[in-house]
Structure formats: structure tokens, C-alpha cells
Amino acid sequence: MNEILRLFPPSVAEAIQHHPLDLTEEIRCRIGQPYVLCTSTGEISLSIPAAPSDLDYILERASNYSMHACETQLRAGYLHTGNGCRIGVCGTITETGLRSISSLSIRIPHAVHDCAKPLLPELLHDGLQSTWIVSPPGAGKTTLLRDLIRLLSDDGYRVSVADERGELAAVCDRKPQFDLGPRTDVMTGGSKHRSCFMLLRSMNPQVLAFDEITAPEDFAAMRYAAGCGVALLATAHAANVDSLQTRPLYRELLCETIFRKAVEIHLENGKRTYRVVTL
């Protein structure tokens, strides 16, 4: 957590330390409003309002004092710190990027070992098949996917990860900061569809994992990978499988029976439950 705290001005970092950081999933910073720590059970509001200089301080530290080098990420509305932490950025959209930044959402990653273990008997019952992980934003899709990758890799599967935003592996100095298992190869930074084709050509995966599939070209890459006999693991924002079917791109893929199973994540009263659905 020291890597997270170092992003904040000292007075803010000190105030944050008085609260349970191990339970904190997001820190919200909005100019003129109190800092808010978001946990699975609710929000904790600090007495300190975020100043414009605070946001500048956070972004400078997060970018290693090179905002220019992070322009591509900022144009997409986020900044990746290199330790698995992703900072969502909100401000004024211009032709050249994002300016006058007014709020930040600092997502704090957590590795929860064996959270996917109870699901393995159902997911592997007929051999591993392509699986969606489905939930609303912030319910723990990435955490579950990360642990599922690790467990499959430990179990002997060759897993390749297209980690476009660096959240799954948090590769730093060529080494993942999260344990993804001994048989996992990670492609970081490139688009998911480009990474998919490169991994298929070079790493001979049995399993391909993606986080947050949204673009049409990503769907095309998954179709191609499935045609090569590779099992897919992917996450999607939706309340459940039924709501996923209302979106044309997902509905097409589901109708093609490329994905045979889904895991729904439900969050109620701070507790996560998982439900495996056969598609």
C-alpha cells in the first residue's frame, strides 16, 4: 500500500492511513469535494477536500513526472501506475487529449488467492471451455479472472494474457507484480486484438485471457482464437448473463456458442457470491 500512499500529498496520505486500506477498493478525488474511500461495505468520507494542486501532484507522481509520455493513456481516460493500479481520469475533452482534469478514481488492486477455487469443479467438469466473467463495474471481475488464470496455470495449462491496461499482471521491470502462475505469458500495453494474434503465433497457448472486452475488433480476435481451439476467459460489464444478451456484439458471440459458461458475480451487503451459468 506504500506504492498507493506515495501518490498523495503527505497530509492526505496521513489522513488515508487512519482507515483500513486493505479493504479499500477505490479512492475518489473530486476538486472541491472531500476525498472518498470506497469499500465493499460502503464509503468513508475524509474531512479534507481535494484541491486542484492535489490532482496535479497525484498525476505527476503516477506518471513518474512525465505526463507527456502518458498522453496515449490519458486520451483513453486513464493512467496506469505500473503496480496494477489504474487511475480513471475525468476532465475536459479536447482534440489533442484530456485537459482541465477535475476528478480521479484511483482503483486499488487486490490479489485474493483461491477466490476462484470453488468454481473450478464446475468450470472443468467437461474440460475447460470458454467462459465469461460478468458483473457490474467494481464487483471484482478482474480479481476473479486473475486468480482463475493463476489456478489454471498451476494446474498445467499454458495461459496467455492480453493485458492491455496492465491491471491483470502489473508487469514492472519485465516481471508481473501479481502471481499469475508458472505457465503464464503476458503481453502488455498493446490492444487486445493485436496481442491476441501475436500470442497465438508465438506462445502456443491453451487458454487466452482478456479483461473488459468491448471493441468489435476484440470480438473478431476471440472468434479467430476459438477457431484455433483455444479456450477463452474474458470479462464483461453487465448485471448478469440475461442483460449481456441485450447487447448486439455479445449476443452474436453467445449465439455462436463460442462461450459455453459464464460466472456471474453478485455483491450484496459487502459480500460477493459467484454463480456458474451454462450457456
Roles of regions detected by a PLM:
Residues M67-L128:
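P-loop NTP-binding catalytic core
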